[in-house]
Curated annotation (Swiss-Prot):
GO terms for molecular function: oxidoreductase activity, acting on paired donors, with incorporation or reduction of molecular oxygen. Keywords: Oxidoreductase, tRNA processing. GO terms for biological process: tRNA modification. HAMAP family: TrhO (MF_00469). SUPFAM superfamilies: Rhodanese/Cell cycle control phosphatase (SSF52821). This is tRNA uridine(34) hydroxylase. Residues 130-224 form the Rhodanese domain.
Length: 328
């Protein structure tokens, strides 16, 4: 039996001097112990997800905690059967969370160490979910919400996190006077976004401390009132949260049956994320439209070594055909 892999999810807002130099040092250490993952380091802090066996992840946590800036850093730990990453990346960025405030004329960025929403533990957050007078707002990208979300949570009409401030301003009159509670995967986005809401004048703003990941592991709430699965930015794609009465809410793009399997459209110029069973991925050569299925650079065709005849037969079976210019 293979050894269990641990996946560590973490962040901390803390001032990091010479952050670019520290990022290089951080990468060197991670590679020296064989860790895999993706870490962002900025002047405002650190945000990462990494994976490895028990010994490797323990070495990493001990090393991080030995730095007084990160002595109290909170690692959220998952146990898995295989690696969640294939390589190790540590990158220096201007911010660990890009809310796009300066890009969109929203004045200056937010420092969560100075301004942020009230922390709610899982029990308090569950109570907020059950409170009719509380607005629960999902701050994640649309494709994350579509895979799973808290029951009754608002899905903003946005594609990604950077569009959220404008959406809130456009809909401010709907919940300006109400209690607003926000949530995200591990908490890092909500630290900054809830602070922005406070600065915008919202009087009662809360956030799920530790994010969805913590809510799903809490022994009391056990992920209850979460529907679907949680999207994660690694090879796992999704993880279960509700351990009381789990459900599947996402539907196969092609036939509408329950499905939590995300794939990217095989047309590299489209790359749309869709839910698809292995059977339908094969049937539709992972293309989200007739144009994508017949695209000359269809990645499914290339990855599976389909001949032109095999490709044409797949499309003919669903009433479509290859254009003449597509090569063999």
């Amino acid at each position: 039996m293979s050894e269990k892999i641990r996946v560590l999810l973490y962040y901390k807002y803390v001032s990091i001097e010479n952050a670019q130099e520290y990022a290089a040092k951080h990468l060197e250490f991670c590679k020296s112990i064989g860790l895999k993952g993706r870490i962002l380091i900025a002047d405002e802090g650190i945000n990462g997800t990494v994976s490895g066996d028990y010994e490797t992840t323990q070495k990493y946590m001990d090393w991080v905690h030995s730095d007084e800036r990160f002595a109290d850093l909170w690692f959220k730990i998952d146990e898995e059967n295989q690696q969640a990453f294939r390589k190790m990346f540590v990158r220096y960025k201007k911010e660990i969370v890009h809310l796009g405030l300066e890009d969109n004329n929203f004045d200056s960025d937010i420092n969560p160490l100075e301004t942020t929403g009230e922390y709610l533990n899982p029990k308090q957050f569950k109570e907020a979910l059950l409170d009719e007078d509380t607005v629960v707002l999902d701050t994640r990208n649309d494709y994350e919400y579509d895979l799973g979300h808290f029951r009754g949570a608002i899905r903003p009409d946005i594609r990604n996190f950077r569009e959220l401030p404008q959406w809130v301003r456009d809909n401010k009159d709907k919940f300006m006077e109400k209690r607003v509670v926000v949530y995200c995967t591990g908490g890092v986005r909500c630290e900054k976004f809830s602070g922005w809401m406070v600065r915008e004048g919202f009087k009662d703003v809360g956030q799920l401390h530790g994010g969805i990941a913590t809510y799903g592991k809490d022994p009391e709430v056990q992920g209850e009132l979460w529907d679907g699965a949680m999207y994660v930015f690694d090879d796992r794609i999704s993880v279960p949260i509700n351990h009381v009465n789990p459900t599947v809410i996402s539907k196969d793009y092609f036939d509408g049956t329950p499905c939590e399997r995300y794939v990217n459209c095989a047309n590299p110029f489209c790359n749309k994320q869709i839910f698809a069973s292995e059977e339908n991925e094969t049937k539709y050569v992972r293309g989200c439209s007739p144009e994508c299925r017949a695209h000359e650079r269809n990645r499914y065709v290339q990855e599976n070594g389909l001949s032109r005849q095999e490709w044409a037969e797949r499309l003919e079976a669903i009433g479509e055909s290859l254009p003449e210019f597509v090569g063999a």
